[in-house]
Amino acid sequence: MSDLQHIIDDAFERRDSITPNSVDPIVREAVLQTIDMLDAGQIRVAEKIAGEWVVHQWVKKAVLLYFRINDNAVLQGAGTQYYDKVPLKFADYTPERFKQESIRVVPPATVRKGSFIARNAVLLPSYVNIGAYVGEGSMVDTWATVGSCAQIGANVHLSGGVGIGGVLEPLQAGPTIIEDNCFIGARSEVVEGVIVGEGSVISMGVFIGQSTRIYDRETGEIHYGRVPPGSVVVSGSLPSKCGKYSLYAAVIVKKVDAKTRSKVGINALLRSIDD
């Protein structure tokens, strides 16, 4: 792995001079191998190590180099054609392979090569970009989008129209992460490398970026860039210092643990926000 990383890091420093026709065969092979490993879930753009999320920047570099070494080509899709540098993940899948990997893909869901879809995941008509990871047993609902390099945990439900932001550049920016057992309500957006902690419930129409104030009404604490585990979050507002107006905020109305979630439905949690 260290040799692969060294080749990618070195090539990235010379990326402006790399074209599909001029790329060194060793670099091409290293990039393609990295994308194949991403596609198979053997490596990830980010992973949790000792309780902290670690971003593997060299993997993001490989994704960016993948665009430089490929020409656009015609891709066959559901009833139409596409013209792009990244092939579709399931282009060469057979019925046997779908069964072996135990995933369900509903047309016209679009998944780019270099993303990983774990066992028992369900993709309704949705979009999953290169470098993304969708965990075991998760559902990506209708018109939801999983951006480049976004990390979706196990048993997550991304409801209809949800947007999970992608990030390739700037290189130092971290990916958006939805941890295990989260529920993201319809038409919500989580972007700019925000981390939603395990077991959280995000209500419909909540928008969270790095500058969004995430207000915990129980403690009065304001978070940025991270929703604490087990949070139930709704749209809200906070007054300005002068008191003349209010600005948007995401509001943590309560905290729940796994035991509570197993006994109480999502809708019940959201209906009882004044409890």
UniProtKB/Swiss-Prot annotation:
Q: Does the keyword Chaperone apply?
A: no
Key words, A-Z: Acyltransferase, Amino-acid biosynthesis, Cytoplasm, Diaminopimelate biosynthesis, Lysine biosynthesis, Repeat, Transferase
- What EC number(s) has UniProt assigned to this enzyme? 2.3.1.117
- Record: residues binding substrate: R104, D141
List, alphabetically, the Pfam families matched.
Answer: Hexapep_2, THDPS_N_2
- Protein origin, superkingdom: Bacteria
Biological-process GO terms, alphabetical: diaminopimelate biosynthetic process; lysine biosynthetic process via diaminopimelate
Subcellular compartments: Cytoplasm
Coiled-coil stretches are none
Family in the record: Belongs to the transferase hexapeptide repeat family.
Subunit notes for this chain? Homotrimer.
Please state what the protein is called. 2,3,4,5-tetrahydropyridine-2,6-dicarboxylate N-succinyltransferase
Record the organism: Tolumonas auensis (strain DSM 9187 / NBRC 110442 / TA 4)
Give me the gene this protein comes from.
Answer: dapD
